[in-house]
Amino acid sequence: MWLKPEEVLLKNALKLWLMERSNDYFVLQRRRGYGEEGGGGLTGLLVGTLDSVLDSTAKVAPFRILHQTPDSQVYLSIACGANREEITKHWDWLEQNIMKTLSVFDSNEDITNFVQGKIRGLIAEEGKHCFAKEDDPEKFREALLKFEKCFGLPEKEKLVTYYSCSYWKGRVPCQGWLYLSTNFLSFYSFLLGSEIKLIISWDEVSKLEKTSNVILTESIHVCSQGENHYFSMFLHINQTYLLMEQLANYAIRRLFDKETFDNDPVLYNPLQITKRGLENRAHSEQFNAFFRLPKGESLKEVHECFLWVPFSHFNTHGKMCISENYICFASQDGNQCSVIIPLREVLAIDKTNDSSKSVIISIKGKTAFRFHEVKDFEQLVAKLRLRCGAASTQYHDISTELAISSESTEPSDNFEVQSLTSQRECSKTVNTEALMTVFHPQNLETLNSKMLKEKMKEQSWKILFAECGRGVSMFRTKKTRDLVVRGIPETLRGELWMLFSGAVNDMATNPDYYTEVVEQSLGTCNLATEEIERDLRRSLPEHPAFQSDTGISALRRVLTAYAYRNPKIGYCQAMNILTSVLLLYAKEEEAFWLLVAVCERMLPDYFNRRIIGALVDQAVFEELIRDHLPQLTEHMTDMTFFSSVSLSWFLTLFISVLPIESAVNVVDCFFYDGIKAILQLGLAILDYNLDKLLTCKDDAEAVTALNRFFDNVTNKDSPLPSNVQQGSNVSDEKTSHTRVDITDLIRESNEKYGNIRYEDIHSMRCRNRLYVIQTLEETTKQNVLRVVSQDVKLSLQELDELYVIFKKELFLSCYWCLGCPVLKHHDPSLPYLEQYQIDCQQFRALYHLLSPWAHSANKDSLALWTFRLLDENSDCLINFKEFSSAIDIMYNGSFTEKLKLLFKLHIPPAYTEVKSKDASKGDELSKEELLYFSQLHVSKPANEKEAESAKHSPEKGKGKIDIQAYLSQWQDELFKKEENIKDLPRMNQSQFIQFSKTLYNLFHEDPEEESLYQAIAVVTSLLLRMEEVGRKLHSPTSSAKGFSGTVCGSGGPSEEKTGSHLEKDPCSFREEPQWSFAFEQILASLLNEPALVRFFEKPIDVKAKLENARISQLRSRTKM
């Protein structure tokens, strides 16, 4: 590798380097201790340790080339190499391309300048594409060289970054280097002859956290496959931890959670991931989440500055954050002040000429924001003016529409109940009013106490709007939060939900989108629409709005449109309940965008098939309970109770457990504070019921106590009519219990748990996501093992180890082949057995690792035939059940079962003639040849193929599962178990010849090799004579004489001699009658030979084989 020219003092360097070659201008040196017998003794040992500790390139590149000039002790290092061949190439290139040119220069300075320029040019050309995005390309090139030489990971494994740290091996810290790449965490250390190499793939990490104890002040704890690893002594531990967390989550999502990963094109190509890119992505995600911006926004600049707050008459210190389409500000001095300015709202951007370095941003509505002490404010103003010019024509202005619509209380004339025959016409009509406005218009003439309180709330908000502004760019302060906690007025609820959730921005950037999606989704029929239709009448059935076709049609349109927009989610139960509440207070199009905000940004991964997001937040909730309510965790040792109880809280934002008039106040807080509000309220509810819960003897009693509490939560200020309020319908029995006002409960949750920061929740979400997905994977494994264990003799522990190896091989092959198609077949929604399937290439690797017959010379052919036998539905993939059935027979099968397996491998559909194109490789098959032969299948009629495909995968290609098809498949599998040996087809002569060759290969190097050879020769001779006698009645000539003589005369033939005879024989039989054997004939003949019976019934230690396979699975591919 060419190096950036750096000065080296040769006088000191000679103690550590030995001269190999030299000329007038260059010196080739070798590191002391490298390439010497015994490693160079003590000197070599110390040099090696020094190189490792100081991160010297010489550890992995013990050769180097220096540029020298006469009469100077200062030399320049220009190249290094990992081995003699690599450095020799560089030396030869210098002699052929540089040496002749140097003689024309007059001065040594000109020579040095020319060499430096030439080497820098080579480095620039070499790293033009690879290292341009790194902070220090030169150091990164050196680290990459060490990473590649030390670990031998795949060529396309992308090194993201590296850190100096200590790895704790027991109680001893080992100083070394931690390398973080897209798929692996790797560590290398070399101290006084002791070398430590550690490779952990991210898919194995179940726990990643920062810890501290008496010995380690701060360390990073990594748990992988039950083993704990601790790394400490980082220079920037928070930065390191953040990157490790991102890489682990990225790998987990790519391999286990493809539902969300496929929607994330930024991370789809592992080769594009860089340290800087990951850091920028993390900052952008936090920025978007905090300000509720669309997912596509990325943080471009951050400036510390002061913002003038006009209604309070002071400057608040904070950070101005700028993305492509937004300018945002968040205070950092405890004032809880934030501002979001969409560039589409900006009219002018000016700067002041005084020393205040001020930027003034004027927006629609005669509002201006003044930012002081902005660094590089002149450049910033120029950039923002350019962006505003580009942004002004892209958006549809809806902020004024929101304000105007919220003041309108008159019902629309468009809402009439339609008959079933005109339902399609009704579906086309998009509601332009919130359902609450239509079904519960406020009557200003009959003002009761509740209506007066509602009017006072509205007046409070109008005062706030006068001070802080109204619309997207309003100041959001502590006063805003206080008003939200008290409950948003009915008339303003839809508008403020849109603002606080950020849905107003989505709607502005996508004008007419909803109308188009409604039209496109109209009339579609799939699993999602069927489920939607089933749940429409279950959505707030007690509310008049959803007892009429007006509300039902609106709900149908919103849910169907969203399922059409996001087919990865489609429709999930609980979405109907949430959407019903949104439609009560927001227009139909606004309700759609609120649903988008909830499902795609505020509650990510909540509404996919495995509700991973909800499970993650449950784990976060459990962690918060341990921290804030320790006495509860001590009493209820099984934390799964909280998970089961809280699931509906998170999925429906408490709507399913609280009366509707109280639940909407919770939704108010959710749209303002996000998931933080739900977690705080959950803690407050448990805290309020703490004494009751501590006296509960079991989970059922605890659930009853909580349900009774929820029934008694009220909203005394709710203006909803009594026929709509659910809290007013409680029975007399329940009224004896203390009532709790929702406003008081929310206020208490803010006072007690308001110090929980969003950053902490984000960190806990990332940390627990690993645990949740690995737990789901463990559940999948246990279900697979439970099904498979019924059909095999392997113990559960052996099956467990076999499954780990099976799955590991799948992932390793994906790491070594980035475009591996097998990952595309992984679908967590499929039945457990179908989630992980391997192709022929991966099966061959596992066969070589695990099969007791893998020593055979034709092991590739055996692996291929076994794969073809197991691949009954001809999709070139096999699952774990099929794989384990073959392994089980090889290890635990009886003599008859093993022989039957070998027999079936040598007849169709498993058997196909195999011959490598490269004669020098013998029976070894290339990847392409293996793929080709695995796809050669016995031809079947088209209709039979379709029937087979449907039979083996009844759930594929259909909207819903076909129960009849599953029952038919189950019945077929029962028949398969009762398969009679008499049903097996006969084996023809070419297949029998290959069968005989396979047996000879299996017996090779066995302790009883000679007796086995003699026994198989006797059996073969006997079979051929039997066939000859049987055919004499039909043919006067003996077609098998030549073959019989060959085998009988061989006695104990060598493998090579046997192979040559067997290959020649088929040619001599081509024009003669074909002979064949039944399985019973072969079985009876082999049973007569004790040596053969002993060979196949010899016990094999499957545990040792599995242990060895687990260890060597990664080592065989790397330099471990």
From Swiss-Prot:
GO terms for biological process: glomerular filtration; vesicle-mediated transport. Interacts (via domain Rab-GAP TBC) with RAB11B (in GTP-bound form). This is TBC1 domain family member 8B. Changing Q246H: In NPHS20; rescues only partially glomerular filtration defects in tbc1d8b knockout fish; defective vesicular trafficking in podocytes. The arginine and glutamine fingers are critical for the GTPase-activating mechanism, they pull out Rab's 'switch 2' glutamine and insert in Rab's active site. Involved in vesicular recycling, probably as a RAB11B GTPase-activating protein. GO terms for molecular function: calcium ion binding; GTPase activator activity. The keyword Magnesium does not apply. Residues 1035-1066 are annotated as: Disordered. It is linked to Nephrotic syndrome 20: A form of nephrotic syndrome, a renal disease clinically characterized by severe proteinuria, resulting in complications such as hypoalbuminemia, hyperlipidemia and edema. Kidney biopsies show non-specific histologic changes such as focal segmental glomerulosclerosis and diffuse mesangial proliferation. Some affected individuals have an inherited steroid-resistant form that progresses to end-stage renal failure. NPHS20 is an X-linked, steroid-resistant form with onset at birth or in the first years of life in affected males. It comes from the Eukaryota. Residues 1054-1066 have a biased composition (Basic and acidic residues). GO terms for cellular component: cytosol. Residues 145-212, 285-353 form the GRAM domain. InterPro entries: EF-hand-dom_pair (IPR011992), EF_hand_dom (IPR002048), GRAM (IPR004182), PH-like_dom_sf (IPR011993), Rab-GAP-TBC_dom (IPR000195), Rab-GAP_TBC_sf (IPR035969), TBC1D8B_PH-GRAM1 (IPR036012), TBC1D8B_PH-GRAM2 (IPR036015). The record marks Q573 as: Glutamine finger. Residues 858-893 form the EF-hand domain. It holds the Pfam family RabGAP-TBC. The record marks R534 as: Arginine finger. Residues 487-674 form the Rab-GAP TBC domain.
